[in-house]
Amino acid sequence: RFKGINVTGWTRSGRAPEGIHTFENLETLVEKNDILILSLFDDAAVTNILDALLRFDLKGIQIIDTSTVSPQILIERADQLYDKGAIFVDAPISGGPELVENGTCGIFIGGDDFSAERAAGHLSPISQRIFHVGPLGTGMVMKTINNSMVQIYVSGLTELIPLAKKAGLPLKTALDILCTGPAGLPVVSDRIPKILGDDATVGFTNSGTAKDNDVFRKILHHFDMRSPLLEGFERQRAFSEKMGLAERDPAEVIRAAYDVSEAT
């Protein structure tokens, strides 16, 4: 149960998450539930699951896709889902595990008014920061803008923080000043213990951030746009891999850049 709500699930891997009753197959999950929240790794996974769902009777079932993937996957199947009787929105989540646990993550819903209002009610136990931003697909567009700004900020910090080391400025001093002034962002201030090496837990991996970066650039490309700043993230990706930090938290890349005095 989650906040008094019975939660059941199904995983493609067959893994049973702790505390959640899981069904053996997707068909049974659909039969036993009228709300399906998708949280999948990439475009291929979402494509596979949506196509599988289209084989079932979806009348009255709400599909809420929280995955960080191209919105075109859902948009291209909208007519088929509608014909099957489904109600559907894209509703990507912005914020790492700590924000989800605290109920402060952002959820950006794209869809018609009825579907979005219904989805917001189902998602309210997860967070109160829920926004209906526009028609189907705009939820992921909003996440692209929001999380791209975070990526650009962190990339800029990893590029500039070696200057502090070279000049003899302590890392903690630089971070404290940044995070208490106009240049501060929660994505850094909340991670100061991780950056300083006092907290080894991983909120989100560098490889996951790199995957999201690929999605964001793909979405820009769909609208005939590009972002040199987002493309510059490739330097941070290469640096994290070079330092063996691909599966570690982005905070550790900031510390590594300081320690080796190497701009990413």
Regions from the PLM with identified roles:
Residues 7, 22, 87-89, 130, ...:
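Hydrophobic beta-strand scaffold residues
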Residues 45, 73, 115, 156, ...:
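Short phosphate-engaging motifs
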Residues 1-19:
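NAD(P)-binding Rossmann-fold cofactor-contacting core
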